Amino acid sequence: MAFGQRNTSRGGRGGGGSSFRGRGGSRGGPRGRGGLRGGRGRGRGRPVFDSARLAQQKEEGEESNSESEESSQDEAMESEEESSDDDDAEPAPAVKSYAALMQSFTADSAPQAKRRKLNVDKEEKQDEEADLMDQDANDADHVEEAEEGPETATDGLLEEEDEEDNSDPFEAHFANPDDNILSRRLKHLENGQWAIQKSILAKIGRAITSVPGDDEAKQTKSSIINSPEELKLKQKLAGVMKKQCPTFDTLEKSISPLIFGYQDLLFCERNTSNAESLRRLTCLHAVNHVFKTRDRVIKNNSRLAREDNSDDLELRDQGFTRPKVLMLLPTRESCVRMVDMITSLCEPDQQENRKRFNDSYVDKEEKYSTDKPEDFRELFAGNDDDMFRLGLKFTRKTVKYFSQFYNSDIIFASPLGLRMAIGNEDAKKVDHDFLSSIEMVIVDQADALLMQNWEHVEFIFDHLNLQPKEAHGCDFSRVRSWYLDNNAKYFRQTIALAGFNTPELNTMFYNQSKNWAGKVKVSSNYPGAIQELGLKVKQTFSRLDSQSFASDPDSRFEYFTSAIIPTLTRRSKDSAGTLLFIPSYLDFVRVRNYFSTSATTRTLSFGSISEYTTPKEVARARSHFYSGRHTILLYTERAHHFRRYQIRGVKKVIMYGLPDNPIFYKEIVGGYLSRSVREGDLEPGDGSVRVVFSKWDVMKLERIAGTERVGKMIKEKGDTFDFL
């Protein structure tokens, strides 16, 4: 049974029930891990990774001991002119009426015809229950708690009487939206009509605002908010913010109107410097939203209790289920940071189950020294397990950890952990009703989630705001009409924070952001990583001709074998110290097999390091490469992401494709070659870099070559570009 599913005998579970090993990247490389526990769990054994390209691995002779996994899916990508800017027509949503919803509950509850059950069925059921109990025993996030009604256990959260303010974005967006504006924008959403405006945010970057309509985006201007005092906060939160953060910095002034105005936001400039500010803003907004939602329910409960003719009152103030905020995070440590920020803002008198939370999530051991990059230490410090889910429940004076999902206000989870909680679609028991009333999704460090399994993120978004299969004690007379009309997805706010934009993030923002308040994408103008290497080296960028995104892997391989390999084989002795960087694991397998079996490369000795290579094999490959026994070393992007190896003996770098993260380009080209110069293995100015790219790499190329250069490099007739 999935975590949070109704169960009168055992309460909610956390995690179990699903047996899939979900992995795979939509861009041709595995993006994460699967398995029942699946987590990288540094310090708990060697890293475990899975592959996403089963079919191609079999064709290319992948090792017999590799685990079987799901095939990656081809991803439709926008052209270079529109990949980072515009939104096109979107499909019209289906509307399910209130009557149809109630009919579905009636149908589900109707008596079913009796069937004879064979003994084998009973044995299978007993085996399944035994498996679930075993999973629960090993599950640190397992919860046994009876499910409460969605809005009945209010627990006296209301502390102060805040008057309803029509200028409050909470009122304007959720509680009392303008019917004329709302109906008009919903119609535009059904027709896929967006008005788009481009602007500049001072000292931040470019902003692309999209609002449902024809020309409304041009009329909408986000004002600057200078301090928390200008926000519509609950009194307690306002008092805390006045002490902790009396004024906003430049970033907070610019994006707080977007966040607190309930617009969707794709912010592509997250880094270690602004991470704390972004965390504070998003947590403040989430807690403020939860408090206002719960207080409205409590106030209306009191009103109904006082009124003699309460049946005549129509107070629609809630959703189908209680959870209102979902936070998707990469590791348990990132969850700890979010939780600590929330508790510092709401200052609860008591924290129930905090010790259990500390035992399961907090790891204070210093695992990495300062020789590791700052972004690496931020992501992998502490407990870096990526298999978790946690419910958080607020009462007037208490925060409760490990609350059952249906009793929670905020759900924290990794994509893998939440998908395991929902269950596999092929399994008998699948539960995603607890996601039916999510009104805010916060995806932090989205670029790190790309290095896990992005398909899990897509799966979760596909199951948000669906009408529930069970009533879960819901009082439908209190449910907001736009929930009953299946329009909840148009009210949900999505906030995605990433270090850079990618086709996956763009696609998610295009397909899943249907907010009637509009959406904003913020990115920067890039000077180019080629200018930030710290040494002088010739960098040659070669553009290959690729007719389609789907055929790009084949075109790239053909270009590599016909244009790059001959330069290596003609002077095999001069090829010593060549690092071949390959972003995609699928391409890595294909190239490795080519080196192993092709007669063309018989004069080239090589080693390889991927995300699946054991530590012992990594040490051997690095040693042979540095000693010269192997002239070429194949190296994947995800291996670098998870380990950041300091590879010695690099004299030349060939990039089969560009990395998503521009920091990787600086570390591999600038860092590795600079080290070789310092250690006397390479004369200054003798190193070289060869980069292969296609028009489908426009986002990566912009970050590495620079915003001003990318257009010419994609469109010019010449296909070779040299930089020093």
From Swiss-Prot:
Alphabetical list of InterPro entries matching this protein: P-loop_NTPase, UTP25, UTP25_C, UTP25_NTPase-like
Keywords: Nucleus, Ribonucleoprotein, Ribosome biogenesis, rRNA processing
Main location: nucleus
UniProt biased composition (Acidic residues): 60-90, 126-150, 157-168
Residue numbers spanned by region Disordered: 1-176
Domain of life: Eukaryota
Cellular component GO terms, alphabetical: nucleolus; small-subunit processome
Subunit text: Component of the ribosomal small subunit (SSU) processome composed of at least 40 protein subunits and snoRNA U3.
Family in the record: Belongs to the UTP25 family.
Name used for this protein in its record: U3 small nucleolar RNA-associated protein 25
UniProt source species: Sclerotinia sclerotiorum (strain ATCC 18683 / 1980 / Ss-1) (White mold)
